[in-house]
């Protein structure tokens, strides 16, 4: 991984760590919605929260519309959707 990629990853992890602990706040309101691929032409890899498996999973997102249960990275998905006891 390039140094730029490592810096980005470190920044995302730091952001996640600085957020209020997930156990004391509500999960992102769209995390409980089913994944919606959207309807634009270009496909990119995104992540959604799977409520049944209680984890973030990759899926092909078409870049617009859909619902809010899509995140650019697995880390962002985990930060917004995982609730720890």
UniProtKB/Swiss-Prot annotation:
Keywords tagged on the record: Disulfide bond, Neurotoxin, Presynaptic neurotoxin, Secreted, Signal, Toxin
Protein task: Beta-bungarotoxin is a presynaptic neurotoxin of the venom. The B chain is homologous to venom basic protease inhibitors but has no protease inhibitor activity and is non-toxic.
Domain BPTI/Kunitz inhibitor: 31-81
Single GO MF annotation: toxin activity
Entry similarity comment: Belongs to the venom Kunitz-type family.
Quaternary structure and interacting proteins, as annotated: Heterodimer; disulfide-linked. The A chain has phospholipase A2 activity and the B chain shows homology with the basic protease inhibitors.
Primary residence: secreted
Tree of life domain: Eukaryota
UniProt key word Secreted: yes
Paired cysteines (S-S): 31-81, 40-64, 56-77
Cellular compartment(s): Secreted
Protein's name in the database: Kunitz-type serine protease inhibitor homolog beta-bungarotoxin B1 chain
Signal peptide: 1-24
Record-linked SUPFAM superfamilies: BPTI-like
Gene Ontology terms: cellular component: extracellular space
Tissue: Expressed by the venom gland.
